[in-house]
């Protein structure tokens, strides 16, 4: 067994797209391959803003994005996550002289050095207190600092048990504005899927993401069911995402 085998994604990282890594995940379906492309596009956008900067990559997961940011010329990258297994993998597979990985809570993490760029891709929807998190980021970044953030902007809490909050374009922008961020740039992404992708989730890397007992869950959350029906009738089977580069006033 090699060192990389000993920390190969297991536990929370095994059988979930929430801990994907383009270097190791067996993304065999077109849907899963598209998932990787979308994640990489977001990090490549963020990479355009990090040259010479001290950067936080919050919810860094397996660290592939932190490495991308370092390779783009960041002076330092603090990769932050709560998943100890993911961080162990990151330290081995995505080590870089400019990157340090920390096990920490996103809302309580106090970076050193203080960053001028805070990257937070597909994070807010997972947090029990996303408003508190944005307030924390705003308290850390200096005037002119950038908060690069992405969320799903179509309903996702029904299909993914790890998602706690559904955002819209308006709700994300309103939250950023509330804490003094002005939108500088955006990236809109669409991820179309077929019913067979949903039915085949048990065989793919998303098997641990799906919400079991969905009918009972819809009974408790009828507004989400209505949002899902409306989305499907108007746009078909699609997930949409918004990435915003926001500047602190």
Spans of model-derived segments:
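Conserved N-terminal segment of class I S-adenosyl-L-methionine
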Residues: 1-113, 117, 121, 131-134, ...
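Short secondary-structure junctions
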Residues: 182-185
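Short "lid" loop at the C-terminus of a central beta-strand within the Rossmann-like core
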Residues: 152-157, 189-193
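Conserved beta-strand signature within the Rossmann-like core of class I S-adenosyl-L-methionine
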Residues: 145-151
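A short glycine-rich, Lys/Arg-flanked "PGG" loop and its adjoining helix->strand segment in the class I
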Residues: 132-143
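Short, solvent-exposed loop/turn segments at secondary-structure boundaries
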Residues: 159-164
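A short His-aromatic
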Residues: 122-126
